[in-house]
């Protein structure tokens, strides 16, 4: 499947804009503020069901109270999203295959791989950012993981609520410890398996983007030690006094982290911005492979301002890496030397 056309009205800074898209590489270029990222957001909204930038009211053009997004693709099923902020209550509606709903039905959701400049903070940002990265991709790949994660998070809220009471007993916490250990074990083991799969190919993907002459090795490590439900249960019980004094659960998968190394040292300390960008893009490449293997379909690839800090060689290799998939790239300038790319100039305003 690939997107063939998009049409937006009163969306972000676009009063109205429409364009056709090619089945392979599309480069939407224009000056900063011309609305390139907004078009990727519209595609994400139509196929994933969510925006990566904000709330519906933020998406409405400053001179309007409504927006409309429509997409056509090779399935011949048109998608239309409308949002109307007029009246007492805002109304949002998806119309797909001539059926209207308040949310995008699961059967019409399509996998999307998105890169934004904010992803560069994955390497040197907070552990919470890296956990969110793991949780987002694993929830997309594995509904069982998503269920276990939600169960863990609900139990964590209840346990932390009890820990805020000075007279809480270990017996009161035990039922929540059991849920945390059972669901937490599944969360940890799935994260570990994902990291193992990433390590099997990330160096190859990195070198593929960086160029054949590059011999740098990349590795990812998940920091958790205990995996079994029994070990986690013992750990929660052993931490009772510390948790009671702190007033929250001090250990578990909600505190874990991943570390990325380049050439044997932590990437956050030594990697250049171009190397960090290449690592993130290698991860996106692996995500695309996993989704294709899991669902038997190639995801849409949306790359926002992807070429910053990448030399021309890495730009060329990046495009070749995602060969035979639809890629929609934004840039401040047309991409030279890629004859097969469909280049779309976006005028400001």
Locations of the language-model features?
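Long, charged N-terminal accessory/stalk domains
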Residues: 121, 132-174
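Walker B catalytic acidic pair
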Residues: 304-306
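Walker A/P-loop NTP-binding motif
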Residues: 44-49, 286-290
């Amino acid at each position: 499947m690939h997107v063939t056309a998009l049409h937006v009205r009163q969306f972000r800074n676009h009063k109205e804009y429409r364009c056709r898209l090619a089945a392979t590489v599309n480069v939407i270029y224009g000056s900063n503020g011309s609305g390139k990222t907004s078009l990727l957001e519209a595609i994400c909204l139509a196929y994933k069901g969510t925006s990566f930038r904000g709330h519906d009211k933020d998406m409405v053009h400053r001179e309007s109270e409504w927006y409309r997004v429509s997409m056509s693709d090779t399935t011949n099923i048109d998608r239309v999203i409308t949002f109307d902020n007029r009246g007492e209550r805002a109304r949002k509606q998806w119309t797909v295959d001539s059926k209207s709903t308040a949310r995008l039905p699961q059967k019409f959701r399509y996998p999307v791989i998105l890169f934004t400049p904010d992803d560069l903070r994955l390497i040197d940002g907070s552990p919470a950012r890296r956990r969110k990265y793991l949780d987002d991709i694993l929830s997309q790949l594995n509904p069982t993981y998503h269920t276990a994660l939600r169960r863990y998070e609900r139990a964590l809220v209840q346990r932390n609520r009890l820990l805020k009471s000075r007279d809480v007993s270990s017996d009161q916490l035990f039922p929540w410890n059991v849920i945390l250990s059972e669901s937490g074990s599944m969360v940890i083991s799935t994260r570990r398996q994902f990291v193992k799969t990433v390590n099997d190919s990330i160096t190859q993907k990195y070198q593929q983007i960086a160029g054949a002459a590059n011999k740098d090795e990349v590795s990812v490590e998940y920091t958790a030690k205990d995996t079994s439900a029994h070990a986690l249960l013992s750990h929660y019980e052993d931490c009772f006094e510390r948790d009671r004094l702190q007033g929250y659960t001090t250990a578990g998968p909600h505190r874990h982290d991943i570390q990325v190394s380049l050439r044997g040292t932590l990437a956050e300390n030594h990697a250049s911005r171009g190397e960090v960008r290449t690592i993130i893009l290698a991860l996106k490449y692996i995500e695309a492979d996993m989704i294709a293997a899991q669902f038997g379909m190639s995801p849409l690839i949306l790359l926002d301002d992807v070429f910053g800090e990448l030399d021309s060689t890495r730009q060329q290799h990046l495009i070749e890496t995602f060969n035979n998939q639809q890629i929609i790239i934004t840039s401040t300038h047309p991409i030279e030397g890629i004859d097969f790319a469909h280049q779309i100039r976006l005028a400001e305003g």
